[in-house]
Regions:
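Secretory targeting and sorting signals
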Residues: 1-35
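Short, intrinsically disordered low-complexity segments
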Residues: 6-8, 128, 151, 242
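Generic N-terminal initiation segments characterized by hydrophobic and/or small/turn-forming residues
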Residues: 12, 19-23, 103, 147, ...
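Residues at structural and domain junctions
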Residues: 19-20, 63, 161
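N-terminal propeptides/leader regions of secreted preproproteins
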Residues: 29-151
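Mature secreted bioactive peptide module from preproproteins
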Residues: 136-259
Length: 259
């Protein structure tokens, strides 16, 4: 499902750029102290050096994709990274990914993935909200009638928000919850986790301690993202709650909201 967005300004916001991924504090080797005026997003050469210097998983692909852009699009890409208004728009769009109550969102194939997207900046930027799940089944029971919403076993449901600029995944944030269902109800929540991949060099994102719980037959997983814009002109702080929930019918919802 696609929806277009327009540029908006909000009086106050807390950053999570789509929704890409773990931005560890900027690599010490990325910025040369002798070049105090240069940041990893100040020029295509500086950004390429940043990607070549980081050990983050996926950096090689991002580097390849960025190099494939022509000079004009490389400059526009970096302008978007340095523009806080872009993150305002993305935050608004990433707020909610809930399904209608008790939607049977998963099947016995053991895996299902759905993706919604919204565009901004004339299609240059795409925000994707993805839901998916994986399944480890129990051995079939004799006489099982197959009337369950889900198969008996252990499920992991995910809610992921990603930002793409010119088709390049810049930041990806994922919340996930692992739980056990008898096929008719959730009986146990095992764990929750969050994953982050980020190649926006002006944003530092860290993960809080994940939380998992069972309430009213629904499994919940939650993680808090904390961080800041490290580019001197922004002064934006990050404080977002990323939550996902599921029941015996499968994935039921997720959101990315201000704390």
């Amino acid at each position: 499902m696609n929806a277009s967005t327009t540029r908006r300004r909000f009086g106050q916001f807390t950053l999570v750029a789509t929704a890409a991924a773990l931005l560890t504090p900027l690599n010490a080797g990325v910025a040369n102290a002798a070049e105090a005026s240069e940041t990893p997003t100040s020029s295509p050469a500086a950004y390429i050096n940043y990607l070549e210097s980081t050990s983050e998983i996926g950096a090689d692909q991002t580097l390849k994709d960025f190099k494939a852009l022509d000079a004009i699009h490389q400059k526009r890409y970096l302008n978007y990274l340095n523009d806080p208004d872009v993150f305002e728009d993305l935050l608004e769009e990433a707020a909610d990914g809930s399904a209608p109550p008790n939607t049977k969102s998963l099947s016995d194939t053991g895996k299902l993935s759905t993706t919604d997207s919204a565009t901004s900046e004339g299609g240059d930027i795409v925000l994707e909200k993805e839901t998916n799940a994986t399944f480890i089944p129990d051995a079939p029971l004799k006489g099982q009638l197959g009337t369950q919403a889900l198969s008996r076993g252990t499920w992991t449901s995910h809610y992921t928000v990603s930002q793409k600029i010119f088709g390049i995944t810049v930041t990806k944030l994922k919340a996930e919850v692992n739980y056990y269902t008898t096929g008719r109800k959730v009986t146990r929540v095992n764990w929750a986790n969050g994953q982050v991949r980020n190649f926006n060099a002006v944003v530092a994102i860290s993960k809080g301690i994940p939380k998992a719980w069972l309430s009213g037959g629904t499994a919940y997983g939650q993680v808090t993202w904390e961080g800041s814009i490290v580019y001197k002109g922004f002064g934006i702080q990050l404080d977002k709650v990323h939550r996902v929930w599921a029941n015996h019918n499968g994935y039921q919802g997720g959101y990315l909201r201000n704390v």
